Amino acid sequence: MTGDRPWHGQCSLQLISKTATDDLQSQLTVHQSQCTAPFKIQRANLDHDGRCQLPLLHTAGGLVGGDQLSVNVKAGADSRGLVTSVAAQKVYGSVGRSKQHPKGRWASQECHFELETNADLEWLPQELVVFQGGLYKQRMQVELQPKASFLCAEVVRLGRTAAGETLNEGAWRSSLEICRQTPIGRQWELVDQLELNSEVLQSLHGMGTQPVFGSFVWAAPHPLTADVMEILLRNCRTDRANLEGSMACGGLDQGLVARYIGPSSQAARQWFSRLWARTRQLRRLSTPQPPREWPLQEEGTFSNERFTKDHQSPSASPH
């Protein structure tokens, strides 16, 4: 927010696949971007497999009620991209209380992702912290063409527990919709709607007083066979070892979904990082390179040794 006016920041990204000039067999991804305050794109980095890593900076340092953010990403055919955030996002106590909005106004973010054939996009923002009384809602819409892959993960902390804060009248609301174009038309792959508030936080059937929630979703480029899915889920469950919290995962018709509930943002990040590496391994892609903006990961999270030691490692199409 600037003065008494809420922000309405917009960011548009386009990812384009091109042939490397020094190696006609090598593909790399470049980007075009257009942003308005408080968004700013930092310097892009290229992974060793030509994937474009884009750090997105929110210069305002946090959100308050009424702030709106819009992100639009179009990934061209055969492009590979990873979009992350430079730092954790903060949602402060809501403002603008009135008869119409007795708890204050919501801060919001709308994300739209459009992936062409064979595109591969990973949306991996850093942690979101909802302060006491903060109100935040987001909507993510994903449109996939055949053979496109979309992966996203998010970690949310409800209240600053280290400071003794609770959520009080704050809330976090999320909607994720993924659909894919097929020979018989558009098919829904996932519709996921969640709301976390103080009641859910305290409920034994909800968060059970645990302050951290995480969600991981992978829409795979191809259907996974029953055998491949069984081994993938077994490995993902094994990857929970030595991490605190409650973790569960399951298969989609064409992909993977996982949830974390617990006390530790770090544990959620570590488990999701391991799952991320599993999806890369399954497609015979390079081991993930954590963006340099991220906090240090646990030693060995992305080591080849962790994954090659499995007695059964499933493999699928490399695209």
From Swiss-Prot:
Family statement drawn from the similarity comment of this UniProt entry: Belongs to the UreD family.
Subcellular location: Cytoplasm
Claim: Amino-acid biosynthesis is one of the keywords in the record: no
Chief location category: cytoplasm
Top-level taxonomy: Bacteria, Bacillati, Cyanobacteriota, Cyanophyceae, Synechococcales
A molecular-function term among this protein's GO annotations: nickel cation binding
Alphabetical list of Pfam families matching this protein: UreD
Organism: Prochlorococcus marinus (strain MIT 9313)
Function: Required for maturation of urease via the functional incorporation of the urease nickel metallocenter.
Quaternary state and interactors: UreD, UreF and UreG form a complex that acts as a GTP-hydrolysis-dependent molecular chaperone, activating the urease apoprotein by helping to assemble the nickel containing metallocenter of UreC. The UreE protein probably delivers the nickel.
Statement: the UniProt record of this protein carries the keyword Chaperone: yes
Name of this chain's protein: Urease accessory protein UreD
Renumbered residue ranges of the record's region Disordered: 284-319
Keywords: Chaperone, Cytoplasm, Nickel insertion
GO cellular-component term (any): cytoplasm
PANTHER family: UREASE ACCESSORY PROTEIN D
